[in-house]
A protein has these predicted regions:
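Active-site acidic/histidine clusters and adjacent loop/turn architecture
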Residues: 2, 13-26
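Charged, low-complexity intrinsically disordered regions
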Residues: 3-11, 40-55, 60, 68-217
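Amphipathic alpha-helical segments
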Residues: 22-39
């Protein structure tokens, strides 16, 4: 599937207007039918955020615009979090193409960088605040191997649940270079994009739980 591109005018970033605000606030509207009793709110950036049950598990979905990295095009990150506790020792963050400018993540605060096991995607860096062995490595590596690494930015396994950070849109290169047009989110996110990400997190969470279960016999 082709990545969504911005279609705003050359000075859209200077004149937000009602249409831009409405598009951002309604960016997740097409995804609402996926959830049971969803709670929709608008974040400080103006983009929608959803919390609700999906297939019996609690999810939080938010959208984060990113225009701080001067070497990259402005983009939108989709943060999808399955908020169900896990019996793990700490937070395990696998970051793709780390730049140090990932303001949406606690990756930069984690002090313990671990060797990347065989089978993980190229360009992956792993950090944790836990000590000793990290038993989720095989599960995490298998999960990441099934994803489009060009869009994948981060996967987190933590006591509070699991998260994937996904690239859903970036600014049109020509417009941005010529006019600095960085308008994003004009087209709403579809359920066809979000549902597979949530399904994948359900599987990842279940696999981590299974790996943490006591072994008998």
């Amino acid at each position: 599937m082709e990545m969504a591109r911005s279609t705003g005018g050359p000075f859209a970033f200077l004149r937000p207007g009602a249409a831009r605000a409405a598009a951002r606030a309604g960016y997740l509207d097409l995804c609402l039918p996926l959830f049971e009793q969803p709670i929709m709110r608008v974040s400080d950036t103006g983009f929608a955020r959803i919390s609700g049950q999906y297939k019996g598990q609690m999810f939080d979905v938010q959208v984060v615009p990113d225009s701080l990295n001067l070497r990259k095009l402005p983009c939108l990150w989709l943060l999808v979090t399955l908020v169900e506790r896990l019996p793990v020792a700490g937070s395990y963050n696998a970051m793709m193409r780390a730049t140090g400018a990932e303001t949406f993540s606690k990756f930069g605060d984690l002090q313990n960088q671990v060797a990347v096991p065989v089978g993980f995607p190229e360009g992956c860096t792993i950090r944790t605040d836990a000590v000793g062995d990290w038993p989720v490595s095989a599960v995490l590596g298998g999960y990441m191997a099934g994803l489009d690494t060009a869009r994948l930015k981060e996967v987190v396994v933590a006591k509070t649940g699991v998260r994937v950070v996904w690239l859903v849109e970036e600014a049109d290169r020509g417009r941005y270079l010529l006019f600095r047009d960085a308008e994003l989110g004009a087209q709403a996110l579809t359920a066809a994009v979000l549902a597979p990400l949530m399904d994948g997190l359900c599987g990842l969470w279940a696999d981590v739980m299974a790996g943490a279960a006591p072994k008998h016999g």
